């Protein structure tokens, strides 16, 4: 009897599993908010050089008149946001003269700071620390620092969970998220903000990895797809929730508090979660595993079945799992054989490009000239049909085709969007939304596809590699936006080209629909080579038939 059958005996998808999954989905709502938080907390309001109050008051000039006299025009014919004249051009006061000769006048960066519009935001980190003009790239850097924390968290907290358990690391991650998020809200300067956001990113990885592990290891195999989809939809709802919270909280510090304080509640009730019995057995803690299984059986109303579980029965039921645990495998096994190496290379590119393009679009909402709150809702809502389509296509068409089409179609749409004139904002927004939906479908597919491609003995290592590549994509994505300052079309070309290239690499991956999960590397190698041998045999038989027909004169007549 396997551990999956043992779970069915103790209630299957019972009251305990339903309660646990529900409680773990609440934090996922706010994980989406933290990932996309800088769309609002680091939004850039309209701004201009701050007026010298003493000068324009003493000269009987209103504020707009002062701006006209003190700032040159930019390429769009508007007062420049970053430059001012060295000397105020008082000679054009009270006239209709323009800045025709402004290029010949001496200018300098704003000396008094900046004035920011409060039409949409009361306060952001941009207005707090003047992250504009010469410091504007710090906005993208802050998001990359956060994604760097997500990467480091995946490496450190993911590894520690295999040593100290999923439950302990999940509890710690909730606490770290609450504290670091709280500290971010009270950051006195940009440097401390980046440090606390880095720690927040680490905690987010710990929550994501250990939540997934506890859900998967406590629910029966038959409902894993459903619970995984539920978690995915929770993330999507979280994107809609962020738009509502940001609309209500126009101050970035209050918004940061709003998405961080609930993690103290999650931290408190997470002590109720039991440790993964599967992990306990594989870690040699069978006695505690028996206690946890009995507790779960009791909660599911299967107390009699729980009493039948003993140390001996638990060990005998998990012989296969224990045998796999005793085998020694390392990250090197991900590239040791030709087939696994091909799978690892292709999946690494798929994960990188999906995350890279996804966050490149999702973190650039202000460029659509639409209400940032509305576009956040639209970008979040498109994930619902995308994930429904992806799930349906995976079942009826297959994983390979779904993955390939979602990447190539998304990449082509994003690439084409770079050629649409900026005046056609409705078309540009619609294409961006469609492209983001394709990438959401890709994310939904690649999680399951990766799990099915890697054998049991190196599955966690494979997922770890792919997760790392996705984090690197998330780190690089904001930095590519900086190129747009020099070549406006270039970011979309890069965001669109990456999914197309990775989509072509999917051609080299095998189909996994309706096939049992492989347990060993040898099993994967045989599964790939078997169809090739079968095709070779069919070709040989076909050639022999043709040769036989040529040698037989009756066949020639016929």
Swiss-Prot record:
* Gene name as annotated: slc22a6-a
Protein family according to the UniProt entry:
Belongs to the major facilitator (TC 2.A.1) superfamily. Organic cation transporter (TC 2.A.1.19) family.
Name-wise, this protein is: Solute carrier family 22 member 6-A
Membrane topology, as annotated:
Multi-pass membrane protein
Q: Enumerate the Extracellular topological stretches.
A: 37-140, 189-197, 247-253, 364-369, 422-428, 484-488
Q: Which InterPro entries match?
A: MFS_dom, MFS_sugar_transport-like, MFS_trans_sf, Orgcat_transp/SVOP, Sugar_transporter_CS
Q: Where does this chain mainly localize?
A: membrane
Please give the function described in this protein's UniProt entry: Involved in the renal elimination of endogenous and exogenous organic anions. Mediates the sodium-independent uptake of p-aminohippurate (PAH), 2,3-dimercapto-1-propanesulfonic acid (DMPS), cidofovir, adefovir, 9-(2-phosphonylmethoxyethyl) guanine (PMEG), 9-(2-phosphonylmethoxyethyl) diaminopurine (PMEDAP), ochratoxin (OTA), acyclovir (ACV), 3'-azido-3-'deoxythymidine (AZT), cimetidine (CMD), 2,4-dichloro-phenoxyacetate (2,4-D), hippurate (HA), indoleacetate (IA), indoxyl sulfate (IS) and 3-carboxy-4-methyl-5-propyl-2-furanpropionate (CMPF) and edaravone sulfate.
Could you describe the post-translational modifications of this protein? Answer: Glycosylated. Glycosylation is necessary for proper targeting of the transporter to the plasma membrane.
Indicate where this protein resides in the cell. Answer: Cell membrane; Basolateral cell membrane; Basal cell membrane
> Sorted alphabetically, which CDD domains does this protein's record hold?
MFS_SLC22A6_OAT1_like
- Region entry Disordered: which residue ranges? 539-558
The chain's Cytoplasmic topological domains, given as residue ranges, are 1-15, 162-167, 219-225, 275-342, 391-400, 450-462, 510-558
Annotated organism of origin: Xenopus laevis (African clawed frog)
Molecular function GO labels: transmembrane transporter activity
**Entry coiled-coil feature ranges:** none
Q: Does the keyword GTP-binding apply?
A: no
Q: Where is the composition biased (Basic and acidic residues)?
A: 539-550
Task: Give the CC-aspect GO terms.
Answer: basal plasma membrane; basolateral plasma membrane
Q: What is stated about domains?
A: Multiple cysteine residues are necessary for proper targeting to the plasma membrane.
Q: Where are the transmembrane segments?
A: 16-36, 141-161, 168-188, 198-218, 226-246, 254-274, 343-363, 370-390, 401-421, 429-449, 463-483, 489-509
Keywords of the record:
Cell membrane, Membrane, Transmembrane, Transmembrane helix
